[in-house]
Amino acid sequence: MPANPFAPNSQAGKVAVVTGASSGIGRATVQQLTATGWNVYALARRAERLAILEAETGAHPVTCDVTDEAAVRAAAKNILAETGGRVNALVNIAGGAIGLDRVADGSPEDYLAMYRVNVLGILNTGRAFIPALRASGEGSILNLTSTAAEGGYEGGAGYNAAKFGARGLTEALRLEEADNNLRVIEIRPGMVHTEEFSLNR
């Protein structure tokens, strides 16, 4: 079995980029990675929360909206300039759900917003960092999806559709990058009590 790329003490000093880092699972991921020796760049929209995270963990704060392709590319350019082009792991945690509307009452705007953050966010960061991850010779991408990517539920069609999309993108990416020694991992958690999920749902 291949070694766990995120195991404690096995990757000290390597560079990770974590999205959705200002709260919830993303914040906890930054805390765990920095505690085990990773050099972490923490991406999120809320600069004030990133500043607190920096003080607590030493992570590098990067204010960025993953749905904004130009902003992601600019952030990646700055990160790669600081690291000498080196990134070993991309951890895509940014995501979210909006509302509980049934399909008959669904808001196209809400559906698009969920698709942008849950699917296009992964696309944007992937396009920005995959060349550096390939160059590392042992890069890893971890995409957080959801058990909502396994089956529909009432009032969740927009979120289901977005997470199914993220799952499909991840599975295709895994096949596409296999020959580049780029590991692509998907984690599908069930319901997690976080501030953001409570606000969105």
Spell out what each predicted region is.
Residues S22-S23:
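Conserved glycine-rich cofactor-binding loop
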Residues G151, A172-L182:
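Active-site-adjacent segment of SDR/Rossmann-fold oxidoreductases
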Residues D101-V103, D110-L112:
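Substrate-binding pocket helix/loop in short-chain dehydrogenase/reductase
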